[in-house]
């Protein structure tokens, strides 16, 4: 997929850069593989705002994506590649030999007519094929990686994302993630071959604020431009720096304050993503 620019007949089109989706399927999704999606506007069951700056946006239908890929040793044929408004990656509709249909994350270089298969044994190292990490060749580029066997893929699922299998150790696979983190994952966890589709997503430019509103994101206001009743940084005569270390609207330290508690799974992280920055 290429990027698309426009002849600037309006100011917002001057900066606009979007992904050219002309090669994608133009019809509606398979109804049996969709669910309704209700917007919350950032409100909880009491009607109170729990996530600020969310609301509006185009109505969406949720596509049910098969992240688990547990339909073993049944070959599937890719019918088409589709757009999905709920994620940055494209999705692929797969027709299995037994008549079942499913949506999967579309990796790069997967096209209509291609064959894909998932197995608990070693299979061909081709984009879209899924197998346990213990059978994937070291050095392979992978996506949709499970963190617990049977839980479904959690790592490397967004547009252009991938992880690299860099080694094995005592039944564990060593992965290098895009963030620079190296971590251990059990060898029986499934992963799909290839990098996720739509790598050009990183290069888009919305060109105007309204395009962000179409996605359901409302304008984001800084605390220093508010009144004292609305934010600890608010008030003052003229422009101020806030007068204190950065805090949230509820007075808790932010911007660099560490909030992550140590987890038992920290032992799976061999190299932190923060080490790269030093």
From Swiss-Prot:
Q: Which family does it belong to?
A: Belongs to the universal ribosomal protein uL2 family.
| Assembly behavior | Part of the 50S ribosomal subunit. Forms a bridge to the 30S subunit in the 70S ribosome.
Functional note? One of the primary rRNA binding proteins. Required for association of the 30S and 50S subunits to form the 70S ribosome, for tRNA binding and peptide bond formation. It has been suggested to have peptidyltransferase activity; this is somewhat controversial. Makes several contacts with the 16S rRNA in the 70S ribosome.
Name one molecular function that GO assigns to this entry. structural constituent of ribosome
Keyword 4Fe-4S part of the UniProt annotation: no
Keyword terms of this UniProt record: Ribonucleoprotein, Ribosomal protein, RNA-binding, rRNA-binding
**What Pfam families does this protein map onto?**
Ribosomal_L2, Ribosomal_L2_C
* GO process annotations (BP): cytoplasmic translation
Asked if the keyword Ribosomal protein belongs to this entry, the reply reads yes
| Protein name, per record | Large ribosomal subunit protein uL2
Q: Which organism is it from?
A: Rhizobium leguminosarum bv. trifolii (strain WSM2304)
Q: Which GO terms describe its cellular component?
A: large ribosomal subunit
Per the record, which residues fall in region Disordered? 202-278
The record's listing under InterPro entries reads: NA-bd_OB-fold, Rib_uL2_dom2, Ribosomal_uL2, Ribosomal_uL2_bac/org-type, Ribosomal_uL2_C, Ribosomal_uL2_CS, Ribosomal_uL2_dom3, Ribosomal_uL2_RNA-bd_dom
């Amino acid at each position: 997929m290429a990027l698309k620019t426009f002849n600037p007949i309006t100011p917002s089109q001057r900066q606009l850069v979007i992904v050219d989706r002309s090669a994608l399927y133009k019809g509606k999704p398979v109804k049996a593989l969709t669910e309704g999606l209700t917007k919350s506007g950032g409100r909880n069951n009491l009607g109170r705002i729990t996530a600020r700056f969310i609301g509006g946006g185009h109505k969406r239908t949720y596509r049910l994506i098969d992240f688990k890929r547990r339909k073993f040793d049944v070959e599937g044929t890719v019918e088409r590649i589709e757009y999905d408004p709920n994620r940055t990656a494209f999705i692929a509709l797969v027709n299995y030999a037994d008549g079942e249909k499913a949506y999967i994350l579309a990796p790069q270089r997967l096209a209509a007519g291609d064959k894909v298969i998932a197995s608990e044994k070693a299979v061909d190292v081709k984009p879209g094929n899924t197998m346990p990490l213990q059978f994937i060749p070291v050095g392979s580029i992978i996506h949709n990686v499970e963190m617990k066997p049977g839980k479904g893929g959690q790592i490397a699922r967004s547009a252009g994302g991938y992880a690299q299998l860099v080694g094995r150790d005592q039944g564990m696979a060593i992965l290098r993630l895009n963030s620079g983190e190296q971590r251990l994952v059990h060898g029986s966890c499934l992963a799909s071959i290839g990098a996720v589709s739509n790598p050009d997503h990183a290069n888009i430019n919305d060109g105007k604020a309204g395009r962000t509103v179409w996605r359901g994101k409302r304008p984001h206001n800084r605390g220093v431009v508010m009144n004292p009743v609305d934010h600890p940084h608010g008030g003052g005569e003229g422009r101020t720096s806030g007068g204190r270390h950065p805090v949230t609207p509820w007075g808790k330290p932010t911007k660099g304050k560490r909030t992550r508690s140590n987890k038992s799974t920290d032992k799976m992280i061999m190299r932190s993503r923060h080490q790269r920055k030093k």
